[in-house]
UniProtKB/Swiss-Prot annotation:
InterPro entries named among the record's database cross-references: RNase_HII (IPR022898), RNase_HII/HIII (IPR001352), RNase_HII/HIII_dom (IPR024567), RNaseH-like_sf (IPR012337), RNaseH_sf (IPR036397)
GO biological process, any: mismatch repair
Ligand binding (a divalent metal cation): 27-28, 119
Protein name: Ribonuclease HII
Residues in RNase H type-2 domain copies: 21-211
C-alpha cells in the first residue's frame, strides 16, 4: 500500500463536535515486552503540518525513527512521558498499569488537555478524561503518530541502558521483547530485577517458575516510579 501520511481529521472533528481546543494524542509502547516498563507518550501538536515521513513508529527504520523523534520533540507544542514499572505491572495488571502510565504522562503536560485521542479500540483511561479511541491512530492521526515515535525511541533508549548492566539479555536489540537471545539468557540466568514476574513466560522455565508471582502493595498504594529502573525518567 502507498504511504498515506497521518492527518488532523480526528482533531478537527473533536474541535467541531466537542469544542475541545487542547487535544493530546496518546500511544504506548512495551505492552508485550517481558522486561522493562510500559511507556506512554502524550503529545499536543495543534493543527500544524508535521515533519515529513511521520507515521506509526513500528513502520520506521531505527535510524529514521531516531531522527524523526528528535524533530518531533522540537516540533510538537508539548509532550510528556509516563512509565509504569515491571513491579507496578505485576501488582496492577496491564490495563491498570497502562492507565497509570498514561495519567502520569497527561498530568506532566504543561496544560491539561480538553480531549484525548487514544490509539486502539480500548479506552484504558476512562473518567474523568474525555477520550476518543481510534484504531490504528498511530498511522492516521498526527498527534498519536507523534506520541508513538517519541515513546518508542525513549523506551528503546531506556532498554539499551539496562542492556549495559545485563548484556546477555540483548535488551539493546530486543527492547525487552522475546527473542532467541533473550530466551536463552532467561533460561540460563533467570529473570533480572527488570522482568515482569507475573507473565506466562516463567511457566516454560521450570527452574525459575518459583519466582512467578503477582505482587501487591500492603497498603494498597502504588509506589512512585522514579529510580525503580536504575535511572531518572
Amino acid at each position: 500500500m502507498p504511504y498515506e501520511p497521518p492527518t488532523h481529521t480526528v482533531e478537527r472533528s473533536l474541535r467541531a463536535t466537542t469544542g475541545a481546543k487542547v487535544i493530546a494524542g496518546v500511544d504506548e509502547v512495551g505492552r508485550g515486552a517481558w522486561a522493562g516498563p510500559v511507556t506512554v507518550c502524550a503529545a499536543i501538536t495543534g493543527l500544524r503540518r508535521p515533519p515529513e515521513g511521520l507515521t506509526d513508529s513500528k513502520l520506521l527504520t531505527v535510524k529514521r525513527r531516531t531522527v524523526l523523534a528528535e524533530e518531533l520533540r522540537k516540533w510538537v507544542t508539548s509532550y510528556a512521558l509516563g512509565h509504569a514499572s515491571p513491579e507496578e505491572i505485576d501488582a496492577l495488571g496491564m490495563t491498570a498499569a497502562l492507565r497509570l502510565a498514561a495519567v502520569r504522562a497527561l498530568e506532566a503536560l504543561p496544560v491539561r488537555p480538553d480531549a484525548v485521542i487514544l490509539d486502539g479500540k480500548h479506552d484504558y483511561l476512562g473518567s474523568p478524561w474525555k477520550v476518543r479511541t481510534v484504531i490504528k491512530g498511530d498511522q492516521s492521526c498526527v498527534a498519536v503518530a507523534a506520541a508513538s515515535v517519541i515513546a518508542k525511541v525513549q523506551r528503546d533508549k531506556m532498554m539499551a541502558e539496562l542492556g549495559i548492566e545485563h548484556a546477555d539479555f540483548g535488551f539493546a536489540a530486543n527492547a525487552g521483547y522475546p527473542s532467541p537471545v533473550h530466551k536463552a539468557a532467561l533460561a540460563e540466568r533467570g529473570p533480572t530485577p527488570y522482568h515482569r514476574l507475573s507473565w506466562a513466560y516463567l511457566d516454560a522455565l521450570p527452574q525459575w517458575r518459583h519466582l512467578k508471582k503477582v505482587r501487591s502493595w500492603a497498603d494498597g498504594s502504588v509506589p512512585e516510579i522514579e529510580g525503580q529502573l536504575g535511572f531518572d525518567f
